Amino acid sequence: MAAPGEALTSSGYIAHHLSNLSLYKLGLVGSETSFWNVHIDSLFFSWFTGLIFLGIFYKVAKRTTAGVPGKLQCAVEMIVEFVADNVKDTFHGRNPLIAPLALTIFCWVFLMNVMDLVPIDFLPYPAEHWLGIPYLKVVPSADVNITMAMALGVFALMIYYSIKVKGLGGFAKELALHPFNHPLMIPFNLLIEVVSLLAKPLSLGMRLFGNMFAGEVVFILCAAMLPWYLQWMGSLPWAIFHILVITIQAFVFMMLTIVYLSMAHEDPDH
C-alpha cells in the first residue's frame, strides 16, 4: 500500500483494493465462486447509503412547512419534481408506484455512486490497521452482484406488470407474434423477443457496473502512483469529472427503469 510502512507493490496495492470483504476471504465458504460467497462490504455500504436516503427524506417530510423552506427541503423538492417530471413524460400507463420507485432508484444509485468520491485509503486503511478488516470496497455499484441484483429486481417488475396488465395470454402473444404477425414466424419472433427481454436486465446492470468499476480503477491507479499524502493531487481532477459520471449513471438507470416498466404497461395491439 502507498501508506507508510506498507510493503505492497503497485500491482499488489491495486489487487488489494479491488478485492471485496467476502465470506470466502474470511474462510467461511470453500469456494470464491460459491453462491453463498456474500460480499459483506458491498451489502453493508448499500444498506448504509439506503439508510442515508431514508433518513434524509424522513427528516424533510417530518419538518416540511408551508412557509419559507430550508435548503435541505428545497433540494429534496427539486429532486422529487425532477423525477416526477421524467416519470410524467416517459411513463404512459397508470401506476402510482412508478414515481416513488424511480425516486428511490435515482437517489439510492446516486448515493452508492458517490461513495466512489471517498479517497481510496480513507476507509480501507483504518479498517485494516485499526479494526483488522483485511479488505474493504466502499462502492457498492462497482460490485456486479449489487448492480445485477437491482437490474433483476427491475426485470421481475417488468414480467409482473406485463402479465398483470396484458394477462398471461397477452404477454405470450406479445412474445410470439411480434414483430412479425404470422404463425410461421413464431419461432423467429420468440427468439428475437426472448433475447431482447433478457438483454434488458443484463445491459441495465452491466452498464452501471462497468462505468463505476472503471471509475474506481482510475482512482486506484492514481493512488498507486503516488504516496498516500499526495494521492489527492492525482485523484482530484478525475473526481471533479466523475461527479458528472455518477449523476448520469444514476439518471440512466432510473430512466431505463421507467422506460422498461412503461413498455410493460403498453397494450401490444396499439
Swiss-Prot record:
The chain crosses the membrane at residues 38-58, 98-118, 143-163, 208-228, 239-259. Signal peptide: none annotated. GO terms for biological process: proton motive force-driven plasma membrane ATP synthesis. The keyword Repeat does not apply. One of its GO terms (cellular component) is plasma membrane. InterPro entries: ATP_syn_F0_a_bact/chloroplast, ATP_synth_F0_asu, ATP_synth_F0_asu_AS, F0_ATP_A_sf. One of its GO terms (molecular function) is proton-transporting ATP synthase activity, rotational mechanism. It is a multi-pass membrane protein. It is found in: Cell inner membrane. Keywords: ATP synthesis, Cell inner membrane, Cell membrane, CF(0), Hydrogen ion transport, Ion transport, Membrane, Transmembrane, Transmembrane helix, Transport. Belongs to the ATPase A chain family. F-type ATPases have 2 components, CF(1) - the catalytic core - and CF(0) - the membrane proton channel. CF(1) has five subunits: alpha(3), beta(3), gamma(1), delta(1), epsilon(1). CF(0) has three main subunits: a(1), b(2) and c(9-12). The alpha and beta chains form an alternating ring which encloses part of the gamma chain. CF(1) is attached to CF(0) by a central stalk formed by the gamma and epsilon chains, while a peripheral stalk is formed by the delta and b chains. NCBIfam families: ATP_synt_6_or_A, PRK05815.1-1. Key component of the proton channel; it plays a direct role in the translocation of protons across the membrane. This is ATP synthase subunit a. The gene is atpB.
